UniProtKB/Swiss-Prot annotation:
GO cellular component terms, A-Z: plant-type cell wall
Keywords, alphabetical: Disulfide bond, Lipid-binding, Signal, Transport
Matching SUPFAM superfamilies: Bifunctional inhibitor/lipid-transfer protein/seed storage 2S albumin
Protein's recorded name: Non-specific lipid-transfer protein 12
One BP annotation, GO: lipid transport
SMART domains according to UniProt: AAI
Keyword Disulfide bond: yes
Gene Ontology molecular function terms on file: lipid binding
InterPro entries: Bifun_inhib/LTP/seed_sf, Bifunc_inhib/LTP/seed_store, Plant_nsLTP
PROSITE patterns on file: PLANT_LTP
Organism of derivation: Arabidopsis thaliana (Mouse-ear cress)
């Protein structure tokens, strides 16, 4: 069977489509462990530890694709339901406090499906 240019083009497009990331590689355990140093601060139990901002910046670098950002959002919402005593104002301001600019609000009511990588 001879491969025509049309078949080769279709195979290339199919290969690219299959190789493109459509699912997140970030697990909720990674999100919570990365931000664990922030817990005392976010519950009004202490000052902002420098390691908290290291975690925020690390998580920002990890979540570069739309599926990853959506997953981080869902993980944060889930954690927010489980952790009692969180100061929602401190949670919302945490990226800015740590010098990270993200194009969507941090809130437990954020629609994670609306998050993208567009700035």
């Amino acid at each position: 069977m001879a491969f025509t240019p049309k078949i080769i083009t279709c195979l290339i497009v199919l290969t690219i489509y299959m190789a493109s990331p459509t699912e997140s590689t970030i697990q909720c355990g990674t999100v919570t462990s990365t931000l664990a140093q922030c817990l005392t601060y976010l519950t009004n139990s202490g000052p902002l530890p420098s390691q908290c901002c290291v975690g925020v910046k690390s998580l920002y670098q990890l979540a570069q694709t739309t599926p990853d950002r959506k997953q981080v959002c869902e993980c944060l919402k889930l954690a927010g339901k489980e952790i009692k005593g969180l100061n929602t104002d401190l949670v919302a301001a945490l990226p800015t406090t740590c010098g990270v600019s993200i194009p969507y609000p941090i809130s437990f009511s954020t629609n994670c499906d609306s998050i993208s990588t567009a700035v």
